[in-house]
């Protein structure tokens, strides 16, 4: 069985409807020590929702944290996110610059 290092760095990907929401989420998760750092920026998103094609602007948020904090971070995002079904995707740091990881 694969052993998972709970201290492994991960980046959690989510989106927010606007800059203000992205900034609030970023500040709150860093303040709550659920993340070390967040980055966010605007993107154009094309998707299907409730049978209709949508073309919107939203903000991607990269949340840098550790594997052991993921479940608490996920709960926080679900509870406080303006979307009813936010994207919450964990991207493991399989390889990264060693000094940055620490």
Which role does the model predict for each range below?
Residues 1-102:
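Positively charged, small/polar-rich N-terminal and surface patches that mediate targeting and assembly
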């Amino acid at each position: 069985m694969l052993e998972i290092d709970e201290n492994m760095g991960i980046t959690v990907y989510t989106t927010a409807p606007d800059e203000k929401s992205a900034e609030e989420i970023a500040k709150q998760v860093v303040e709550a020590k659920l993340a070390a750092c967040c980055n966010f920026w605007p993107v154009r998103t094309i998707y299907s929702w409730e049978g209709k094609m949508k073309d919107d602007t939203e903000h991607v948020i990269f949340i840098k944290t550790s594997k052991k904090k993921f479940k608490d971070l996920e709960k926080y995002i679900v509870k406080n996110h303006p979307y009813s079904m936010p994207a919450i995707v964990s991207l493991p740091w399989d390889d990264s610059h060693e000094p940055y990881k620490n």
